[in-house]
Amino acid sequence: LRHAQIGYNYRITEFQAAIALAQIENINEIVFWRKKSGKLITELLEATDFFKIQATPDYIEHSFWCVGARLKRDLKTWYKFRDYLFEKCGERLFGAWQVPYNEPVMQNGDFRRYLDSENNRIEYSKGLCPNAEEIQKEMMVFKTKYRNQESLDNFINGLEKTIKEFK
């Protein structure tokens, strides 16, 4: 099962803390590459007629943890696009597994043991957010993890080839 239970153990080991500290010390470079990657990916996807990108208002500066895009085609095409992209550049993209309240841990009610009695009556059922449930099936999530021009170019070239194949 995916996400079979919820845990609230937020402690980390010294090793994990050292990794986190190193990441924080490099935050400016990490964010620089995420923004650069995100902008390039967004431009490519927006130039097609089969992707819809969530709008970012002008007053917000996007940090691009990822680029989420809705593929306006059927599920069969979703899988073909994903596989073709991997073939062209060796990179995988993600899909939205399902909306969080449809995860097994929410559906089986195990999370309730962490709630006080007032919040224990909350119900999560399919159909709660029909728009999110519909969009979830069409989402492609593109990573922005690239930390140098060579790896970014590899992905962008693969994405360009994949888009041309599906036009």
Indicate where each model-derived feature is located.
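PLP-dependent aminotransferase class I/II
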Residues: 1-167
